Amino acid sequence: MRKVILAVILMLLILLLNATLHAAKWEHLASSGVYVYYYDVDNIGYLSEVTVQIILKQTYEDKDSVNQFYQKYATDENSIELEDYSISTMVINCADKIVGIKSIISYKESGEVLLQTNFNNINYLFIPSGSIYEALYDKVC
């Protein structure tokens, strides 16, 4: 019995250590007045000499105000459940200064996934001057 308890404790410690090692390290990128943006500094992937994959987290500066705005226009047919945060996988081509979105996942604070969208074909857009994407470009390119 003692060996079983010791094995369970050891497994829990391994799981805890594994979760800690793979936790995202979010660094503040910018704020827009409505949203706050962070990027995961530990998971920047250089896919080629000019292409970078980044994980971007978006939260609200004042979620209650945004929620009140959405609920003002919601009806029974189109009720809106506002996420607490979203995680996007972005791809930036540094040479051409373009950005595309690979996926977006919207979450509740509990970790429950509200919506997940994966894009098979990435549509790239030029990075506008002064945008969140330019701030991200400046960090990783």
Segments from the language model and where they lie:
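N-terminal secretory-pathway/extracellular module detecting exported/lumenal segments
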Residues: T20-C141
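Positively charged n-region of N-terminal signal peptides that target proteins for export
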Residues: M1-V4
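Bacterial N-terminal signal peptides
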Residues: V8-L16
